[in-house]
């Protein structure tokens, strides 16, 4: 997370970009946006953190055990097509007009490219990235989205983000699971974004 944010910040600054009108990040991308906003090196006018992952607030040994749990869970999905389809049913997670068999063939092949080291790094960084004690004051208008079907899983993230960013608004998206809105319903996603950004049709 920290490395990605540093690289993005450097790139923006090298290209003369000193502020952003809007920013969006989902899941791990939401973790990156949380870190980006906290540092405040490049002010953002409006930000949407969609089911963003926040740092664990527990002892190191428990964080290591949680990382091990996530690692093995993800590893099972990468090794078993049946587990992949049970966790993410093709009838729900295939875009209209796409062949679910071809889509999941490609997804399964892609997941196998992840090394054990990469998987561990992803989960450790997503849940243990550093934040300053208090975020930079930039006047950003921000909102945290989550799918209502993942509300229990996001509970600790919501609790943390509300405490860390007091101005953060929270919005549950009906009938949606993790990252489902942006991945499966682009028109609805645009509608929600326009509503937040106060853009007219």
Per-region residue spans from a language model:
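Short, hydrophobic alpha-helix immediately C-terminal to the catalytic nucleophile
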Residues: 34-38, 190
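Conserved alpha/beta-hydrolase catalytic His-Asp/Glu region
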Residues: 58-59, 79-136
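Catalytic histidine-centered segment of alpha/beta-hydrolase-like enzymes
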Residues: 176-187
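Conserved serine/cysteine hydrolase catalytic core
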Residues: 117-163
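Structural beta-sheet core signal
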Residues: 23, 49, 144-146
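Flexible "cap/lid" loop of the alpha/beta hydrolase fold
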Residues: 38, 44-75
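Gly/Ala-rich beta-loop-alpha elbow adjacent to hydrolase catalytic centers
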Residues: 24-33
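Active-site loop/oxyanion-hole signature of alpha/beta-hydrolase fold enzymes
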Residues: 1-24, 187
């Amino acid at each position: 997370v920290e490395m990605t944010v540093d690289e993005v910040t450097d790139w923006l600054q090298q290209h003369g970009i000193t502020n952003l009108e809007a920013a969006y990040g989902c899941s791990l991308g939401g973790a990156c946006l949380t870190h980006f906003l906290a540092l405040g090196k490049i002010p953002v006018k409006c930000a949407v953190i969609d089911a963003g992952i926040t740092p664990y607030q527990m002892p190191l040994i428990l964080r290591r055990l949680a990382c091990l749990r996530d690692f093995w869970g993800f590893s099972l999905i990468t090794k078993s097509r049946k587990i992949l389809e049970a966790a993410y049913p093709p009838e729900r997670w295939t875009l209209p007009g796409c062949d679910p068999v071809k889509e999941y063939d490609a997804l399964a092949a892609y997941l196998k490219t992840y090394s054990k080291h990469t998987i561990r790094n992803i989960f450790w960084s997503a849940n243990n990235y550093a934040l300053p004690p208090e975020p930079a004051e930039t006047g950003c208008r921000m909102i945290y989205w989550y799918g209502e079907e993942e509300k229990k899983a996001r509970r600790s993230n919501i609790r943390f983000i509300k405490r860390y960013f007091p101005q953060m608004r929270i919005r549950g998206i009906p009938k949606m699971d993790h990252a489902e809105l942006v991945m499966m319903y682009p028109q609805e996603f645009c509608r929600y974004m326009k509503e937040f950004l106060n853009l007219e049709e």
